[in-house]
Amino acid sequence: IGKKIFIFPLLFMFVMIICAFLYHNSISYVENRTSISENANVLAKDLLNSRISVYQFMLETNIDKRDKVIENFETLSKNIALFKNRLHIPKNILLCEESIELISTYLKIFNNMANIKLKENNENLKEYNQDILKMANIGKDLENKIFALNEDIVNIRNDAIKALTTQLTILGFITILIFFLASSFISRNIAKSLNNFKDGLQS
């Protein structure tokens, strides 16, 4: 009987070790997804700040404002490249690569537009207007890609949280079931042992 009762603490320790292992792996994954989601939000904010700096250049045209635009977009490009290294899903990696290419194209067009505006050369007004239109289209495309990336990352994070909740629920149910079956088995064996002992005394 003593040996059978001793199974309980061993079973409890075994189940707790499994629970701790699964929880550690699951929570680490959720924390990683949450961190990536936060970085994706930062990229969206960086894009907004970069585009605002373009409008500021248009309102107050000078070299400092131009350099600020270039600095903001180059920083955004570097941050996207770093962010891409943390991703594993091909479509999100592709979104990052396409965003970096768009930024490169955007800056080339912006530099040309900025030079025309800084020189106040009316002879190149048509080219200037064309550059503005191209920048608007590229900016919108870039915005869509970063927002799509951000949305997908948020969905992945939410799915990870749901998966963790489901795993813990299933684990709790299995734990209760194991203890119930184990206790029933041990109780029957104890009762059987006691009956055998009783029969032995009466014989």
Question: Each predicted region: which residue ranges?
Answer:
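Generic recognition of well-ordered alpha-helical segments
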Residues: 52, 78, 137, 192, ...
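Polar/charged, Q/E/K-enriched amphipathic alpha-helical segments with strong coiled-coil propensity
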Residues: 2, 59, 64-66, 84-156, ...
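The DHp (HisKA) dimerization/phosphotransfer helix of two-component histidine kinases
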Residues: 49, 56, 75, 82, ...
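N-terminal extracytoplasmic segments of bacterial inner-membrane proteins
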Residues: 16-22, 32-78, 98-119, 134, ...
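Juxtamembrane transmembrane-helix termini
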Residues: 25-35, 58, 185-188, 192
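Selective recognition of signaling/oligomerization transmembrane alpha-helices
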Residues: 7-13, 42, 151-201
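Amphipathic alpha-helical segments and their boundaries
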Residues: 2-52, 85-103, 124-131, 158-165
